[in-house]
Structures are given as structure tokens and as C-alpha cells.
A protein has these predicted regions:
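Short His-centered aromatic/hydrophobic patch
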Residues: 113-116, 134-139
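Membrane-proximal helix-turn-helix segments that form the acceptor-binding/catalytic region
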Residues: 118-126, 161-184
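Structural motif
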Residues: 130-131, 152
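A short, active-site helix/loop in glycosyltransferases that binds the activated sugar's phosphate group
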Residues: 141-143, 180-197
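N-terminal strand-loop element at the rim of the active site
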Residues: 20-26, 39, 43-106, 194
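Histidine-centered beta-alpha loop that forms part of the nucleotide-sugar donor binding/catalytic region
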Residues: 21, 74, 136-137, 157-160
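Extreme N-terminal starter segment of soluble prokaryotic enzymes
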Residues: 13-17
């Protein structure tokens, strides 16, 4: 974005927010998000990572010092985390804390409760950023519903489209019509999305 003011050009660096499962865990998605976030931060972009879960003191991979990390649910054994830990335990024994909005096809659905879901939706609704990047199909679906209209939304896919059940594929396609951009793992997946969107 170029801003012309008094015959000078100022470059307003776009802010990026990544909405992801757990920046504190090991995994391919974590590694790719870390690399991209670090590159953006090195170029001067304000970068925030919203990590739904936290179970360790430090992110698994080293993050640029300018990157902000916001945690929604902290599972470390500390007194201040009692509510989150208790909600997660109780969910296993009662249907009252089942999710209402997260897709039933989310592969890790057992990790989510209505308590976690509410925190996720609130975070998406209140995120102030130029670009919001979802890193999981179910997260992208939530972003398509709850992100502010002025935010550029990106669905970063880390699974092949055909790996999803047929019903989930339909749910994804319907939601992604409200997403601005999609990144895919393969050219074949790119073509599948382009043919349906």
C-alpha cells in the first residue's frame, strides 16, 4: 500500500495474523507457519500468531522477536489455567460442552469443547489485522463466518482435498466462497478448488 503525502511515498506494511492450532507443538504446519511468519517479520510486517492451544513454555520452532503470540487456551499446569483444563476434562463425560459450530468432520474434534469454540469465535471476531490466515479447514470455515469484512482472508490448506470426507468437501467449498484467497498443497488441488469456486 503506497500512501502519497506531501510528495513523499510511505509504505504501510500490511499486518498479518495466523490463526492456528498450536504453535507450541511439533509438526509440518507449525514449521511452515513459523518460516512464513519469520520471513514476514524480517521484512517489517507486523505479525501475530493466535495459537488456540498451548502446552509448553516456548514455541517449538524459534520465532522472530517481533512476532506476537496470543494464546486462547493454556493447558500448562498452572492455577490460572484451571478453568481451561477443567472444561477439557468435563467435556469427555458430558454432552453439554460439545462444540456447536466447529465442523463435525474436524479430525481433532475431541480436542475442542464449547468453551474453546467460544474463545476461537471471539478471537476471530475481534482480530484487527490486514490479513488473516487460517491454517486448518475447520478454522478456515470459522474465519469465513466470523472475520470482519474488511480483512483479507486466506485459507492455507495443509491437507489434500480428496483426503477430506465428501460431506466435509462440500462444507469447505461452501465456506471458501467467503474466503479471499486459498493456498493448496498441489496443482491438482488448486484446479479442484478453481473448478468449484
Amino acid at each position: 500500500l503506497n500512501i502519497i503525502e506531501n510528495n513523499e511515498v510511505f509504505y504501510a506494511m500490511k499486518s498479518f495474523t495466523f490463526f492456528m492450532h498450536n504453535i507450541y507443538a511439533m509438526g509440518g504446519t507449525v514449521k511452515s507457519v513459523t518460516q512464513l511468519a519469520n520471513t514476514l517479520a524480517e521484512k517489517g510486517h507486523p505479525v501475530t500468531i493466535i495459537s488456540v492451544f498451548r502446552g509448553a513454555d516456548s514455541p517449538y520452532f524459534e520465532l522472530h522477536s517481533a512476532i506476537k503470540v496470543k494464546v486462547l487456551v493454556d493447558y500448562r499446569l498452572k492455577l490460572k489455567n484451571t478453568r481451561a483444563i477443567t472444561a477439557n476434562r468435563i467435556k469427555k463425560y458430558t454432552p453439554f460442552l460439545n462444540t456447536k459450530v466447529i465442523s463435525q468432520f474436524e479430525p481433532g474434534k475431541s480436542q475442542f469443547s464449547s468453551y474453546v469454540e467460544k474463545k476461537m469465535i471471539k478471537a476471530i471476531r475481534h482480530t484487527k489485522t490486514d490479513v488473516l490466515v487460517g491454517t486448518r479447514a475447520s478454522f478456515n470455515i470459522l474465519i469465513s463466518k466470523y472475520a470482519k469484512a474488511e480483512i483479507v482472508t486466506i485459507a492455507m490448506e495443509h491437507m489434500n482435498f480428496d483426503a477430506h470426507p465428501d460431506q466435509y468437501q462440500k462444507e469447505i467449498i461452501a465456506a471458501y466462497r467467503n474466503i479471499n484467497k486459498i493456498t493448496t498443497l498441489t496443482v491438482a488441488d488448486q484446479q479442484k478448488y478453481q473448478s468449484q469456486l
